Amino acid sequence: MNVIYTKNAPAAIGPYSQAIVTNGLVFTSGQIAINPESGAVEAQTITEQTEQVCKNIKAVLEAAGSSLENVIKTVCFLKDMSDFAAFNEVYGSYFTGKPARSCVAVKELPKNVLVEIDTVAEVSE
């Protein structure tokens, strides 16, 4: 088991890693719209936040030897399901392979963000 860390994605804000690689798979922790350069949530809209989340996931996957194209499954958390269409528009531009997915509305997310996504992906050989 290997713990993944990259400066190109936000550092964990709790007692967890950015990702773990084991048995040819990478499991990313949930990513929120923290800008890794500033350490702050700067994006305000669901579109902007989803864009930042996807960039963060891409950076973690690349650090783990994987990519967005290798994603098998995502779990998506939205603060408001009325954001579903706008979220899907950005999400679909990043996850073009259409991985399996769960998407649920939740009452609240860390730092009061609008979206959080975690992934499972194959590690490139």
What are these language model-derived features?
Residues 1-125:
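Short, polar/acidic, helix-capping and beta-turn segments at strand->helix junctions
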